[in-house]
UniProtKB/Swiss-Prot annotation:
Entry EC no(s): 2.7.4.22
Organism: Methanococcus maripaludis (strain C6 / ATCC BAA-1332)
GO MF term (any one): ATP binding
Gene3D superfamilies, per the entry: Acetylglutamate kinase-like
CDD domains according to UniProt: AAK_UMPK-PyrH-Pf (cd04253)
Protein's name in the database: Uridylate kinase
Family as reported in the entry's similarity comment: Belongs to the UMP kinase family.
UniProt-annotated binding residues for ATP: 9-10, 47, 51, 141-142, 147, 150
Amino acid sequence: MDVVFALGGSVLMPKEGASTENIQNYAEAFKKLKEMGHRVSVVVGGGNTARQYISVAREFTNESFCDEIGILATRMNSMLLISALGKDAVKHVPENFKDAELILNMDKILVMGGTHPAHTTDAVSATLAEFIDADLLVIATNVDGVYDKDPRCNEDAVKLDKINTKELLEITGSASMSAGSSGVVDPLASKIIDRAKLKTIVVKGIPEEILASVTENHNGTTITP
């Protein structure tokens, strides 16, 4: 199966900072998926690395330039994961989908970050999945699925086990699009998922759920066309 993962930067690089063990655990999960015969692509977010830089830069510059800073942070995080993957990856972070596809055609795990200002890595992962005709998009984040409202702000939020892409659009329609913003699925990514009719799964960004996402045994939300 051809699977694209959107790996949240905040799960790879939490507030506590880089952890060799944490990064290695993710690398081992992706290696195992490759060994199982899956073609694996990973789009890594900027997470706290990006937000720290952006919060300072925002005092001096505009959102577009802050986006550029965020993109560089995603590529730094990508390089960390690439280093942990060893021979299963290529020591290069592609900046466009054509170069990304070349890496996949080398039978390697593809790891990349952001590409353009105003595009979150969720949107990049959805577009990549459409570009390579992936069978599945998995969004691995710091929330364990899609809720009817933001569970971080609403104690009565209800997790949805299964929704369709139109329902996803309704839920995500009013989310923030500023540099460094971090919703479960951002509005642009939701539109691409709907347009491309992508089967998508949103799971808690831990190695166990990443492995379970290629089966029906995950604990997240399944989004169907």
